[in-house]
Curated annotation (Swiss-Prot):
Organism superkingdom: Bacteria
Protein family membership: Belongs to the RecA family.
UniProt keywords, alphabetically: ATP-binding, Cytoplasm, DNA damage, DNA recombination, DNA repair, DNA-binding, Nucleotide-binding, SOS response
Taxonomic source organism: Thermus thermophilus (strain ATCC 27634 / DSM 579 / HB8)
UniProt cross-references to CDD domains, sorted A to Z: RecA
Protein name as it appears in the record: Protein RecA
Amino acid sequence: MDESKRKALENALKAIEKEFGKGAVMRLGEMPKQQVDVIPTGSLALDLALGIGGIPRGRIVEIYGPESGGKTTLALTIIAQAQRRGGVAAFVDAEHALDPLYAQRLGVQVEDLLVSQPDTGEQALEIVELLARSGAVDVIVVDSVAALVPRAEIEGEMGDQHVGLQARLMSQALRKLTAVLAKSNTAAIFINQVREKVGVTYGNPETTPGGRALKFYASVRLDVRKSGQPIKVGNEAVGVKVRVKVVKNKLAPPFREAELEIYFGRGLDPVADLVNVAVAAGVIEKAGSWFSYGELRLGQGKEKAAEALRERPELLEEIRAKVLERSDQVVLAAGEDEGE
């Protein structure tokens, strides 16, 4: 950029800052990370992609994506992390599809989990607001926005038209909820589905139910969907690789991605996740299918390397500390193919 353009840009930025306040416009690479309380996601790769170490408390988070992509698994893992730190969690099951046994396998303390299965969208959102106002709940998950059916639709006939009711419901509720969550320092996670807009020829035809309010009020939006081939042991599929893209982030630079590995029946494997990130950070070396830490050979294949680290917790923590030291240089290439 030549000198005249640079000065013109500086003058424009100063005028904008004077009119609208500091931070109204900034360079993406210089965007400061805000210090907020967070709840870890259970995946180091995703915590680093979020830039703040987890999902923010006192804010709204939207997790959306196609069916069976790992959205509920991720939300339940966050609940387990909150409970592990002594927090209280609530699950508003609008879909009436919560599996307590699966939640337990993910580490959720189901006997302490607050669960509601509301009849209407209004009831669900009122429950969320009351729980947040109490100041005693650390994280609330709503599964899902698409299942928040307005009372008028429930009480009406099957063929009745109810245009915009759900969008209006979400807009009214979120206007109130945003301030309540900030005061109580409660994280609210809304799980959402995707729909396709009819007649879209150019651009992305996907949209999410519930209108635009959730997109606007959410501090973080995560796009969660399967990527690549299933994880196999021999010929048996034992899990799926899931790519999470931080589509919106008000607290750190957005558009980062993390690839997670979700295993059937047990969810995220934090040790395998750490191995992926440590390789990306250069803490663990990968030559062919062999994984090494310094002079120590961990094993052939990620499963063997992860197993070796599980048997040596002190080594696991040492590697984690080194990864965190290099977190600013980490290129999140978690879950890359092992060529096995």
